[in-house]
Design a protein with these regions (language model features):
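Rhodanese-like catalytic fold shared by cysteine-dependent sulfurtransferases
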Residues: 2-50, 57-90, 97-135
Length: 135
């Protein structure tokens, strides 16, 4: 799917500007992964996709997509095998806006996970789409 390369703000101002080096890493990852939007998420879940929130623990605790598993970006490579997730499972990753999840998706692909998707727009997109969330 083709999504914009500019951040989707959903009517909100981003808290900070990202550095050019970080954005370069994100763009490199985005060129090699699949992405979806929040509007696609319900159908993906209905078709068996596992949703993983890669934000920090405090972000997850403040609210997350209902049914999402939490594995932070900083530990996902180390901890994903602690869960019953196979290399062929469809996995949708999200973060705050789609940047961290893109990097994590590329990392999981490099580990052999073949059906990983990053949610472009992330948590902000989930909220804007009015999807079910919980704390």
């Amino acid at each position: 799917m083709d999504y914009p390369h500019e951040p989707v703000h959903y009517g909100r101002v981003m808290a900070k500007q990202h550095s050019p080096r970080f954005l370069a890493i994100v763009e490199a990852a985005r060129s090699e992964i699949s992405e979806c939007s929040a509007a696609d998420l319900t159908a993906l879940v209905e078709n068996g996709a596992l949703v993983i929130d890669v934000r920090e623990q405090h972000e997850f605790a403040a609210g997350h997509y209902s049914g999402a598993l939490h594995i932070g970006k900083g530990v996902i490579e180390r901890d994903i095998e602690k869960h019953e997730i196979t290399e062929s499972d469809k996995i949708v990753l999200y973060c705050g806006g789609g940047f961290r999840s893109a990097i994590a998706a590329k990392s999981l692909q490099d580990m052999g996970y073949s059906d990983v998707i990053s949610l472009w727009g992330g948590w902000r997109g989930i909220l804007a789409e009015g999807l079910e969330t919980t704390k």
